[in-house]
């Protein structure tokens, strides 16, 4: 069936897909500048990097990956670096679906590393954890920010914390806050092979602390390989992806069915209270099942 063919992602099956690093945090945390400096550091270490800047607040444009980022500044033209940005709002598979599709494509270009950065003004994205091998959470100095991180559920997903703009007042306090929160929560991987998220201080604009961040990334990758955590994480992501793809496909078929004459008539019955939504839904599902079987 041609549609099933279309939905297939060859990159997803490749066991040696590129390592994926997700960078998230509140808007205004300086993620883009930090990411640019981090890319420069990784390139200097001989890594090849693809950057995917995701804007969950912009409407998805039907698969078009938008042009190169201007915000990357000096590194944008560097060899070994590939930059794309993408809008994801309204993508059938949601943020994760759109991201995973793009990671599969970028991974196929043979890069060592894909860095996924969430941009845009939406709320803090925690979905990134469904696509990343390593999740980096960036916060700004200021006591409130660490508390916000806790509220937004970032404590659970962070593999590495970065206090960016560390030359500002309150940076040291923020580091201390995060450290004590981590002491309480004890990290997020259970078992003897536990990883404790390090807290790295950086100044994205000058590159201060960025080498430490790159070291932390490498340490986390090594830890995941040594403990088998990487395989566990990816298995869980694949299983999650199975459900997402199925839900997206069924949702699409449902919309198609509702757009037919039969679907319109059924909707009209519900709108005019001739049929209750539950009975109508049962008929809809029966018809859909029939149609999916015929396909």
Predicted segments, located by residue:
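Canonical P-loop GTPase G-domain recognition
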Residues: 160, 166-224
């Amino acid at each position: 069936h041609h549609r099933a063919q279309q939905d297939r992602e060859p990159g997803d099956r490749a066991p040696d897909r590129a390592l994926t690093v997700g960078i998230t945090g509140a808007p205004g945390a300086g993620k883009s500048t930090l990411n640019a400096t981090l890319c420069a550091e990784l390139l200097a270490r001989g890594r090849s990097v693809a950057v995917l800047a995701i804007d969950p607040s912009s409407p998805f444009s039907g698969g078009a990956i938008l042009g190169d980022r201007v915000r990357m500044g000096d590194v944008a033209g560097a060899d070994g670096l590939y930059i794309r940005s993408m809008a994801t709002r309204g993508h059938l598979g949601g943020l994760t679906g759109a991201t995973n599709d793009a990671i599969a494509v970028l991974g196929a270009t043979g890069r060592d590393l894909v860095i996924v950065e969430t941009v845009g003004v939406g709320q803090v994205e925690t979905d990134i954890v469904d696509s990343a091998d390593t999740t980096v959470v960036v916060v700004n100095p200021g006591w409130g920010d660490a508390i916000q991180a806790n509220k937004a559920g970032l404590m659970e997903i962070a593999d590495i914390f970065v206090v960016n703009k560390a030359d500002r007042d309150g940076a040291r306090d923020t580091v201390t806050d995060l450290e004590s929160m981590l002491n309480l929560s004890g990290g997020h991987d259970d078992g003897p092979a536990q990883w404790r998220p390090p807290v790295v201080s950086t100044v994205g604009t000058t590159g201060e602390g960025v080498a430490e961040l790159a070291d932390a990334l490498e340490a986390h990758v090594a830890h995941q390989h040594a403990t088998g955590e990487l395989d566990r994480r990816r298995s869980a992501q694949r299983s999650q992806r199975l459900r997402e793809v199925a839900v997206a496909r069924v949702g699409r078929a449902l919309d198609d069915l509702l757009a037919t004459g039969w679907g319109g008539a059924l909707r009209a019955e519900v709108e005019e209270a001739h049929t209750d939504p539950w009975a109508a839904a049962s008929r809809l599902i029966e018809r859909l099942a029939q149609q999916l079987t015929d396909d």
